């Protein structure tokens, strides 16, 4: 299954608050970006001023996603939504013309 993730925190819970973006806390907070054996991270994009990130990930179940994102969930709001691959669906139906 594919999931769309929106993760955000504020300036008070930012891992870079002490030590800046090179701090060990930032490195650890962003470790989820690497994925793991159960969750493949397909892409991650961020916009630093609002402390917000977006990702598309792939996993067989939501429990694996929750386990991967637990650290993010502890420092701010994290929204995870299952999504469909509409390009693959269109191709599977034989509707893809190019």
Regions found by a protein language model. Name each.
Residues 52-57:
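Short cationic amphipathic helices and targeting signals
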């Amino acid at each position: 299954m594919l999931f769309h993730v929106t993760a955000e925190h504020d300036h008070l819970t930012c891992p870079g608050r002490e030590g800046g973006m090179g701090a060990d806390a930032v490195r650890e907070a962003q470790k989820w970006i690497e994925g793991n054996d159960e969750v493949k991270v397909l892409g991650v994009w961020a916009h630093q001023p609002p402390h917000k990130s977006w990702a598309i990930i792939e996993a067989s179940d939501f429990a694996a996603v929750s386990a991967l994102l637990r650290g993010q969930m502890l420092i701010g709001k994290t929204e995870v939504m299952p999504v469909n691959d509409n390009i693959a669906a269109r191709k599977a139906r034989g509707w893809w013309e190019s």
